[in-house]
């Protein structure tokens, strides 16, 4: 459920709507609380834009908590009473659409009901319900005017859904008799097919050869063969040998003791059916995997985690270390492959410390001695014999080499005897 606020001046009325409700319900639910006596000539504004009140909330683009202004339409603000319906209602272009038929175009006012539209074109008895802007209206709602559903002006499409046609009793008699006759014919054909199949079965049975059957032999149980003794002890080698059958057991002549011994041997050597199979059971993959995990957990401790690296992990780690050792750093690679070219000149700004500064450009062939001679030429004879040169960060300037090797574009400070920095040095 969404809450929409109907506003008039400083008054605000909350209205709860479902997504399938029309915006006309905002007017119908709030017009009395906002001080209006009639809802027929009221319209909605969202900001400064007029809202189509026939749209469903889910199709209107209005979000939850939106504020809609309720006001009288411009046609009703000409001094007429708001309780009376405006006689100059606008014409609405209506299109009636039946499935499988051409559209019927008609014009109606907002006070016209759906029932009146259908009666004009003799469609009232043929239609069960209609669909307007995605909302279904049943026959009980046909008496309401279009204005009640928010249809005030413009054009509207009404989809008509016809009543399901029911066949009359006279028209049903013919197909019933036809289907009954067809069922009888099908039943007769099925019976004929069953008779033919039974005759074929009898012919097949009679074609088999006939043998005499002895019923007594069929009822007799089959003899169970007793397996021969695998080995005979040395103490019973003198016993007479006799074949073992299902009807008689081996006997020994004229000696009761020997008979007892033979019976004991026969009992001990009869095959016994044991529940345990002589062949080992084939273990399933899941049981083998569970056993391996259990053994690993016992070997590794109570935590159950295997922290020992495998052979493949060790080999991978060693290959990574070899690659890192063979890699050359980017700085050394750039230095060796492409040496930095020396600048063609060096621009130096000399700061003499008393607010005096000179900028001079040296060529790539000038060395540090040339630079010192240039500085000495701008000093007094006393100061030119002893002075020091430093960079802007007071780092001492080299005494040998080319200028472009050490200076590209820099500030050089000149320290004389009167300079306290020179005295400290």
UniProtKB/Swiss-Prot annotation:
Residues 341-390 form the UBX domain. SUPFAM superfamilies: Ubiquitin-like. Pfam families: TUG-UBL1 (PF11470), UBX (PF00789). Its main location: cytoplasm. Residues 224-257 are annotated as: Disordered. Keywords: Cytoplasm, Nucleus, Phosphoprotein, Ubl conjugation pathway. It is found in: Cytoplasm; Nucleus. One of its GO terms (biological process) is ubiquitin-dependent protein catabolic process. Transmembrane segments: none annotated. The modification Phosphoserine is found at residue 338. Residues 236-254 have a biased composition (Polar residues). PROSITE patterns: UBX. GO terms for cellular component: cytoplasm; cytosol; nucleus; vesicle membrane. Involved in CDC48-dependent protein degradation through the ubiquitin/proteasome pathway. This is UBX domain-containing protein 4. The lineage of its organism: Eukaryota, Fungi, Dikarya, Ascomycota, Taphrinomycotina.
């Amino acid at each position: 459920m969404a809450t929409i606020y109907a506003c008039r001046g400083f008054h605000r009325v909350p209205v709860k709507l479902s997504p399938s409700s029309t915006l006309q319900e905002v007017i119908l639910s709030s017009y009395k609380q906002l001080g209006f006596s009639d809802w027929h000539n009221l319209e909605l504004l969202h900001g400064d834009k007029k809202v189509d009140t026939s749209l469903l909330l889910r199709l209107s683009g209005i979000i939850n908590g939106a504020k809609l202004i309720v006001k009288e339409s411009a046609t009703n603000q000409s001094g007429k009473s708001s309780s009376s319906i405006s006689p100059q209602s606008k014409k609405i272009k209506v299109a009636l659409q039946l499935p499988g038929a051409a559209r019927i175009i008609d014009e109606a006012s907002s006070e016209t009901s759906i029932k009146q539209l259908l009666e004009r074109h003799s469609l009232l008895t043929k239609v069960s319900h209609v669909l307007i802007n995605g909302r279904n209206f049943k026959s009980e709602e046909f008496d309401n005017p279009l204005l009640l559903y928010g249809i005030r002006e413009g054009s509207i499409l009404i989809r008509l859904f016809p009543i399901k046609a029911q066949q009359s009793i006279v028209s049903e008699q013919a197909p019933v008799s036809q289907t009954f006759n067809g069922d009888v014919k099908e039943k007769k054909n099925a019976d004929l097919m069953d008779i033919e199949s039974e005759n074929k079965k009898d012919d097949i049975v009679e074609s088999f050869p006939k043998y005499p059957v002895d019923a007594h032999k069929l009822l007799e149980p089959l003899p169970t063969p007793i397996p021969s003794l695998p080995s005979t002890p040395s103490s019973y080698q003198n016993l007479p040998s006799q074949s073992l059958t299902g009807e008689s057991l081996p006997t020994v002549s004229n000696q009761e003791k020997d008979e007892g011994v033979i019976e004991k041997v026969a009992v001990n050597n009869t095959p016994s059916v044991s529940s345990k199979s002589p062949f080992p059971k084939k273990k399933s993959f899941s049981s083998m995997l569970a056993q391996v995990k259990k053994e690993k957990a016992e070997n590794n401790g109570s935590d159950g985690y295997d922290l020992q690296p495998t052979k493949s992990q060790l080999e991978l780690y060693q290959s990574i270390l070899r690659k890192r050792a063979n890699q050359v750093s980017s700085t050394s690679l750039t230095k060796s492959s492409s040496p930095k070219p020396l600048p063609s000149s060096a621009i130096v700004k000399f700061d003499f410390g008393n607010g005096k500064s000179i900028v001079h450009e040296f060529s790539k062939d000038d060395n540090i001695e040339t630079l010192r001679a240039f500085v000495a030429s701008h000093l007094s004879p006393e100061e030119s014999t002893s002075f020091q040169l430093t960079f802007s960060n007071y780092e001492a300037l080299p005494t040998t080499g080319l200028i472009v090797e050490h200076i590209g574009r820099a500030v050089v400070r000149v320290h004389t005897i009167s300079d306290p920095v020179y005295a400290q040095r």
